Amino acid sequence: GDVYKSQDRDSAKTVAEKREAMRKSLSADTFIAGINAISSDGWLVNIDGTGNRVAAICFGPENVILVAGTNKITGAMQSAIARARNVAAPINAKRFDLPNPCTVSGKCADCISDTTICSQFLETRYCKPAGRIKVILIEEELGF
């Protein structure tokens, strides 16, 4: 049968191993990730600290599979950006135990620091080449 090898940055024992796993994911056959928000007209919004996820969505892997619950669907584009910044980012900062203002307040404070997780913003409206990005939308509340 087929052999699958995953690149799991969370299983890395050192910072160097973590960065290597993130780099290898850029040349993966398939990259799987979540989405921070989806606008009502179909734009995908993602925010990253390091940029490894948004880089892989933009370019690299042959196939990108993005999974989201219907709780990620918002109104217009500004609502999707607001959701990514004020819902997903603070929860993610808390998950990584970062000393950012949003970890305490639950809202984006536009912080600029070495610990910010809002370094890279990606707004995706179209996929080139066609069919490379597949979105799986699940009718339930998933993730943050």
Regions found by a protein language model. Name each.
Residues 1-4:
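Short, small-residue-biased leader/transition segments that mark boundaries at the very start
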Residues 8-31:
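Glycine-rich oxoanion-binding loops at beta->alpha junctions
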Residues 25-144:
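Conserved phosphate- and dinucleotide-binding cores of soluble alpha/beta proteins
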